[in-house]
């Protein structure tokens, strides 16, 4: 199984790496034609863990587990290559900040749940159902490949003052000596709508 080697530093916004950086490959980004404007006002939601992830474009419809930190401060990874995990020390998808969901690209047995993640394009939709029944809808803004040796922890996990969701998996070249991929694929997306059960609507 190709593990996701990610660490978390201080959770605050930093500038993204320069476009000319050889460790960064932009696979997709928002253009004038692909830009999707968010509604002027999206209602606040209560904290509730995500339980179901759907990405229709790549055929993903799976349960969401929870992930924490290992003793060495590396992010845990899902035990099953066909499920995903939400980093539970971050915000609920739809709250202010960066919610992060991780999944495997493949294993020795074949493709994993995020095998086609890198094929997403700006404007594609991502839906998450929360435990309280709230549905949060996100739109992809860009897809970037980062070298693991220069992974921008704070950019991916930090609070940007917006309601964002990052999807992370492995990618790039595979190092047969270590048994791991050399890069990570990160899909950046932003909240565009929520559907809150009547019992949960705040007055």
Q: Residue locations for each model-derived region?
A:
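N-terminal Sec-pathway targeting helices
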Residues: 1-3
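Solvent-exposed, non-transmembrane regions of membrane-associated and secreted proteins
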Residues: 7-203
